[in-house]
Amino acid sequence: GRGIIAALEKLKEKGAYEMYRPDVVIYDVLGDVVCGGFSMPMRGGYADQVFVLTSGENMAIHAAANIAMAVDNFKNRGYAKLGGIILNRRNVKHEEEKVRELCEDIHSRIIGDLPRSETVTDAEELAMTVLEAWPDSEMAGEYRKLAGQILAVCRKQGENNA
């Protein structure tokens, strides 16, 4: 937990947010670590929205449910809200059905649906992102579409808070 906050404080100290003026900052935390490390960006005021990426695998669904419950507990303290679920397909049986059921249980929705793609693993082998390796690929388009969906949710939340 302390390492995450130290990194965020260093970015702030260096003026990274003012210099780059990002629309969105993404913090990637392990789903099985719903503890201080997960909550620090929210408690420190570094997060307004939380988007949970999950597949339809049972352990991923379980971790996503735990994260959603933690976010729900924090929202009453004025911390971040759950922006939605992103389905990162692994092509397991009944995957979409399981994730939709999760969404019903946590009162959320799927805001993005990433297909399983060998393009991702091929890019990883090159130590690159898909957008770096193949910016015109179908998968790069999927990531751009997801970025637009995340921005739409964030902008709507911003309008509701104005």
Tell me the role of every PLM-derived stretch:
Residues A6, K10-V24, V29-D113, D122:
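Conserved catalytic-core segment of NTP-binding enzymes
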Residues L126-S137:
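C-terminal boundary of histidine-terminating zinc-finger modules
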Residues T119:
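Conserved Rossmann-fold dehydrogenase catalytic segment
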Residues R2-G3:
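Glycine-rich oxoanion-binding loops at beta->alpha junctions
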Residues A147-G158:
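Short, hydrophobic alpha-helical segments
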Residues R116:
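Active-site donor-binding loop signature of nucleotide-sugar glycosyltransferases
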Residues P135-L146:
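Short, hydrophobic-biased amphipathic alpha-helical segments
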